[in-house]
Amino acid sequence: MKSEAKDGEEESLQTAFKKLRVDASGSIVSLSVGEGTSVRASVRTTVDDTKPKTMCAPKDSWHGSTRKSSRGAVRIQRRRRSKSPVLHPPKFIHCSTTASPSSSQLKQRSQTEPLDGSSGRGISTPKEFSTGENSTSLDINHTGAAIEPLRSSVLRLPSESKTEELSDATQVSPESLTANDLSDFQSVSKLSQGKPCVCVGKACQCKRWHDMEVYSFSGLQNVPPLAPERRSLEDYSQSLHTRTLSGSPRSCSEQARVYVDDVTIEDLAGYMEYYLYIPKKMSHMAEMMYT
């Protein structure tokens, strides 16, 4: 009877150990056969303790393997396969933007500080600036709430005396600029004339705006006069255009061909080559597509 009971205990212990998952980090329980019913009870309690853990544990943590819990939530973008460079638009860096005070400080100073210097003109310079830059504020006592436009103040600047320009070069605060004034490139470039350059003492790296030449495409105004044979050709084509004997009007391409000159076409082609980045070599796939 005792041996049968022991065999039954061994079988139950073996089945319990098969069902039980023992962690590698946990303590390994060594059981001897002759410990009796107390061992059996303790094994049962451990089985009951660990069973819900294994049932509730997610499948990601089985066998020490870590799997992504969120599958398609965030996907990493692949590298670009084509080796062509990414062309970014050019960034225009102004010379002294780092030292300029914030607009809120400008507003507070223009409202609170006492005004001196130019009472008649409506432009006044504040007494002290930490950055050494000047801005115009409104003379509230004399001119009310009227803001002078940018161009008038720009026109007045060269008429001032040179000492005044050197000491207090008046500039327009960004609050008084409207969209019309900012659209004019020349007036915007006049804003930075009185500001000191950041790189003092070194070789000046940054070009000033007002020294720069602006390219303006004025619509072929400076085209040289045509050769006499061309002029006669043009007159002949215009006379053809005016008289309608056949009754059928000419095609659009013929009408356009009259007014286009070879010189202008060459000029425009050079302009395109100079200002646009056109890669010389095509990629292999593009060559295969076009051939």
From Swiss-Prot:
The keyword Membrane does not apply. InterPro entries: DUF776. Residues 65-83 have a biased composition (Basic residues). The keyword Phosphoprotein applies. GO terms for biological process: cellular response to hydrogen peroxide. It comes from the Eukaryota. The modification Phosphothreonine is found at T143. Pfam families: DUF776 (PF05604). Keywords: Phosphoprotein. GO terms for cellular component: nucleus. Residues 44-139 are annotated as: Disordered. Disulfide bonds: none annotated. Residues 95-113, 127-139 have a biased composition (Polar residues). This is Oxidative stress-responsive serine-rich protein 1. The lineage of its organism: Eukaryota, Metazoa, Chordata, Craniata, Vertebrata.
